[in-house]
């Protein structure tokens, strides 16, 4: 009887409310290099032209963003490998004018073998250990923990990849260099309408005074 009443609508079902997932808000870091987020974005296939398109190439953009100043460094590679993560890291250390204390990444094989082997360290992890840089991994399937670099990739898509094309990796990196200069000098509301370069300059000047 109860089932029949429910079926014809005499008894209303109680709707269960889905619990909304609340993403924890992290405190803003105050020291450049205290934590740097790194991630990889695959270059959209429709951006490829000429030989790159004919050969079925895939390009990948490595991105690092300092959580304090939002200063970024980007570079493109043809292969999605731990070895290219190391190359990118070495370039990053030359580009950022401050000491990096911690690097935060997802669990991709270009960064860690944690979920393939609990004992074997990836080449990237070994390199970080040699350099004395902490490596922080975000939980699996939680890209919002790397939210700053994820948002920067969405901005890259909107302001760069939606408009540009590339025939080879050299052309990608030439154009990325100009885009990086623009993004590092663009004012941001989250930085009180300062650019990453302006905030970095202020932080370094303040450090020199003390």
Set out the residue ranges of the language-model regions.
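Short N-terminal signal/transit or membrane-insertion segments
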Residues: 1-2, 76, 208-209
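RNase H-like DDE/DDD metal-dependent nuclease/strand-transfer catalytic core used by mobile genetic elements
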Residues: 37, 42-61, 69-177, 181-182
């Amino acid at each position: 009887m109860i089932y029949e009443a429910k079926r014809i609508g005499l008894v209303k079902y109680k709707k269960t409310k889905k619990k909304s997932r609340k993403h924890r808000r992290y405190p803003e870091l105050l020291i450049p290099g205290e934590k740097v987020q790194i991630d990889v974005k695959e270059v959209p296939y429709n951006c490829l032209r000429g030989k790159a398109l004919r050969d079925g190439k895939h390009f990948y953009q490595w991105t690092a963003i300092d959580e304090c100043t939002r200063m970024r460094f980007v570079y493109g590679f043809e292969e999605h490998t731990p070895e290219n993560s190391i190359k990118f890291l070495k370039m990053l250390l030359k580009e950022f004018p401050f000491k990096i204390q911690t690097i935060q990444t997802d669990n991709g094989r270009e960064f860690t073998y944690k979920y393939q082997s609990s004992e074997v360290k990836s080449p990237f992890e070994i390199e970080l250990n040699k350099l004395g840089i902490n490596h922080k991994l975000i939980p699996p399937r939680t890209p919002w923990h790397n939210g700053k670099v994820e948002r920067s990739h969405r901005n890259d898509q909107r302001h760069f990849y939606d408009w540009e094309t590339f025939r080879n990796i050299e052309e990608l990196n030439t154009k990325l260099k100009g885009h990086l200069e623009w993004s590092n000098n663009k004012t941001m509301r989250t930085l009180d309408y300062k650019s990453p370069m302006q905030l970095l300059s202020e932080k370094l000047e303040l450090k020199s005074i003390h």
